[in-house]
Curated annotation (Swiss-Prot):
Function: Hydrolase that can catalyze the degradation of ethyl carbamate (also called urethane), a probable human carcinogen widely found in alcoholic beverages. Can also use methyl carbamate, butyl carbamate, acetamide and urea. Also catalyzes the enantioselective hydrolysis of 2-phenylpropionamide, alpha-chlorophenylacetamide, 2-methyl-3-phenylpropionamide and alpha-methoxyphenylacetamide to the corresponding acids. Is inactive on benzamide and L-glutamine.
Top-level enzyme category: hydrolase
Entry-linked Gene3D superfamilies: Amidase signature (AS) domain (3.90.1300.10)
Record's protein name: Urethanase
Keyword Acetylation in record: no
pH-dependent activity: Optimum pH is 7.5 with ethyl carbamate as substrate. Exhibits relatively high urethanase activity (greater than 70%) within the pH range of 6.5-8.5. Has excellent pH stability between pH 6 and pH 8.
Amino acid sequence: MSLGPELATKEQIREIAADYGLPMTDEEVADHIELLKGAIASYRELEHIPERKLPVKYPRTPGWRPTTQENPLNGWYWRCEIEGAKEGPLKGDRIAIKDVVCVAGVPMMNGSKLLEGYVPEIDATIVTRMLDAGATIVGKSACEDFSFSAGGMTCSTGPVGNPYDPTRNPGASSNGSAVLISTGQVDLAIGGDQGGSIRLPSAWCGVYGLKPTYGLVPYTGCAMIEGTLDHVGPMASSPKGIAKLLSVIAGYDADDPRQQGRIVPGFDTNYLPALERGVKGMKIAILKEGFGHDGSDGMLASDPLVDDCVRSAMETFRGLGAEVAEVSIPEHLTAWHIWTAIGLEGFTAFGVNGNGVGTNWNGWYNTSMAEYLARAMKSRPYDMPATVRSVLIRGEYFRRYYHNRYYGKAQNQRHLINEAYDRVLSEYDIIVCPTIPGLPTKMVDRDAGTLDTVVNQLNQLRNTAVCDLTGHPSMSVPCGLREGLPVGMMLTAKHFDDATLIAAAAAFEAAGDWRKM
């Protein structure tokens, strides 16, 4: 057997042609096999070329699966102990990495049985940056299956419990990271965000989580959902932790097309000075459309306790010298519909049909994960949970019968939402609304039907998904307890003005214990 692809058989050519509705004579089949020989020669040559890999600079062992005693809320997927540089700004910090991020030699499953057994051979760009800064990586945090859930019960290693009430959803999909920070098991953590997955669990677990400006933090070496929505960012127990971690992981990366020339070598990534800025003179806009949702469209209804808590936080900002006024962005209410089309069809194309990497972008491709996932999808597709099956079925339905028309229209419309936010942010420094309209919801039984499961796990995104569309930096800040459960307020700023979010969060933290507000 030659190294590389084999020449196709007649049956394989006919099968491919049939998939596209192309009738072929025996002569045409023979012609296509002959034409394939040139491509086979190129592919075999490509097979011999050593593949460029992302670097692995620090020694480590594979680690271990945590015991039940070590992991009462299922916040961990895997434990390890990887020591970084001897000195650096993250020296002494213990960091958990969401299990969508590759760490060489450490098992990775992206919350899914389909990837169980996969071990990356590379470190994601942000992992190398953290280790170079002296961090100690102490494990992979649990996440939802393929990260496509906003609740907290689809992780294949078991549902992740809310630290304030284990019977309730912790928010998702970066729920493991939020839980580990909330319970003091780590100092800092990495989360991913395509529809709110950093900010949602931060809100319901009472921690800080920043979805950075799109492209600011390299996504290279992380599992993709949809290339135009993918974000990765810091989570912490304080704004200082956010600033410290963001300062290390942000910046130019030639392998990430999401940066699109907006971030160049030498881009300033020091966010620590923002901690001392305060909010005096800052103009803060309360987003009218972020409050008062009635839930009639199936999304989570607003809880008056949450709305009042966030509005009370605005009074704190006023007391600190900020100017606060209400604004209206009607496009905020349609953003969820735009996100739905991009999320459904984009994930189907990238995450499933594209084997987790997709095509048509210029950057570093994780070929080992793509091959592993493709084989798993073919041999055991039944391992997909109800949420992922639902996304796949719906996404493929719209692709197959409506020819990506609505995906394209949604991509065109997202720029109008971006412009609407930019208009307000040309007059204000920050836009504020509840991160999630309601308090943490009760978990449904893992054996619940598809409808109950999907609704329970995907109805929290109304306020968060919009900034994944626009790319604006957006941060969840804990602002109070109601009925013993955390409430998060979401702060949004201009593109690449992540520092202003950190400044506002630090000022609010200094104003008093959020648990008593």
